[in-house]
């Protein structure tokens, strides 16, 4: 069964968790098993979110970093926190081999650009 694991950076500001909840709820319309975890500061941690997916029966997991670009968190921290060693994309869980596929960061997308334009316009219109 496919599991989707959203990865958020995290923040000392508790409202960050609301973003994870909203994205997980949205993706739950399309996928049965969706969890989110934070790289730092907030709960659930990435490891806790992974454990939740495994406990629910996920045997293939697509990890979706909600990050704009490739950096240290993407290249080093996410694989380490998931227990992935080197180029190996599998982990062991209760005697089973679990495949983990890490999606690319968001990068540039015109749809995200449209959201940014909307945000600029709304902010400007509220203030002028």
Swiss-Prot record:
GO molecular function ontology, one term from the record: sirohydrochlorin cobaltochelatase activity
Chain residues that bind substrate: 43, 68-73
Binding, Co(2+): 9, 73
Top-rank taxon: Archaea
TM helices/strands, residue ranges: none
Pfam families documented for this protein: CbiX
GO biological-process terms attached to the record: anaerobic cobalamin biosynthetic process
EC identifiers of the protein: 4.99.1.3
Functional summary from the UniProt entry: Catalyzes the insertion of Co(2+) into sirohydrochlorin as part of the anaerobic pathway to cobalamin biosynthesis.
Family classification: Belongs to the CbiX family. CbiXS subfamily.
Binding partners and assembly: Homotetramer; dimer of dimers.
Name of the molecule in the record: Sirohydrochlorin cobaltochelatase
